[in-house]
Amino acid sequence: MWKERAMEEMKKAGLRLTPQRLKLIEVIEKIGGRHPTLKEVYEEVVKEFPTMSFSTLYSNLLIFRGLGLLDFFTLEGETRVEVNCEPHFNVIEREEIRDFVDEELIGEIERRLGRNVKVVNVFMEDRD
């Protein structure tokens, strides 16, 4: 689903769907839901395109971001890819990051803070 949307947005923007961009789209479709680091995305792409530079990868990710297809967030000093661009929570527990959507709670946070919320990162630890 994300792949089709990405290809459609690129077409609407008049951008070429090069083999490298297609591979990047496929990688994000495959691993984007687990909020990969930029390094993890790069490592997947260079398996098929070993000559692609990190700079080229990042430039294309910025294009995708400009098209509203993804965003970035930083966690523990590493930039991660966020494919869910709707307001939500990233629930972070140990090594796992899960999306959690609660529109009512987001609305309450927005009312209390007087801000529009894009994403809230929540770090969880067990009580025991």
UniProtKB/Swiss-Prot annotation:
GO terms for molecular function: DNA-binding transcription factor activity; transcription cis-regulatory region binding; zinc ion binding. It comes from the Archaea. Keywords: DNA-binding. Disulfide bonds: none annotated. GO terms for biological process: negative regulation of DNA-templated transcription; regulation of secondary metabolite biosynthetic process. PANTHER family: FERRIC UPTAKE REGULATION PROTEIN (PTHR33202:SF7), ZINC UPTAKE REGULATION PROTEIN (PTHR33202). Belongs to the Fur family. This is Ferric uptake regulation protein homolog. It comes from Archaeoglobus fulgidus (strain ATCC 49558 / DSM 4304 / JCM 9628 / NBRC 100126 / VC-16).
